[in-house]
Design a protein with these regions (language model features):
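Active-site C-terminal subdomain of aminotransferase-like
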Residues: 2-108, 115
Length: 116
């Protein structure tokens, strides 16, 4: 269950996209990815001008440097994400075993338990 779209597919099909970090343990933030040279020419200036650039943004960006590193032949980001999904599925199974209903059958690390 889940999507069969790879990161390479997204990069091939999009001019720009973002990758969130909090669900894989990052303190906060998203990494914005531009797939073609020149698309990011004024991005930094626009972010700064609109007040969306954090003073410690470089420090926060280091999280992604670590998350996008290799560990045992795969991206650390993917390994952590897969582990989070596996644990969420176990939590969902535990709720079902106790008689709770889930709003949807989620293939992600977000589970929506009905607590009525």
């Amino acid at each position: 269950m889940g999507a069969d779209v790879t990161l390479a597919d997204i990069a091939r099909l999009c001019d720009a996209f973002y990758i969130g970090g909090t669900k894989v343990g990052a303190f906060c933030g998203e990494a914005v990815v531009f797939t073609k040279p020149g698309l990011d020419d004024h991005f930094f200036t626009l972010m700064k001008k609109r007040g969306a650039l954090l003073a410690k943004g470089r420090f926060l960006g280091l999280q992604f440097d670590v998350l996008f590193g290799q560990e045992d032949g795969e991206l650390r980001y993917q390994r952590i994400g897969r582990h989070a999904v596996e644990l969420a599925q176990r939590i969902a199974e535990g709720f079902r075993a106790k008689g709770y209903e889930l709003a949807i059958d989620s293939p992600t690390n977000q589970q929506f338990v009905i607590l009525d």
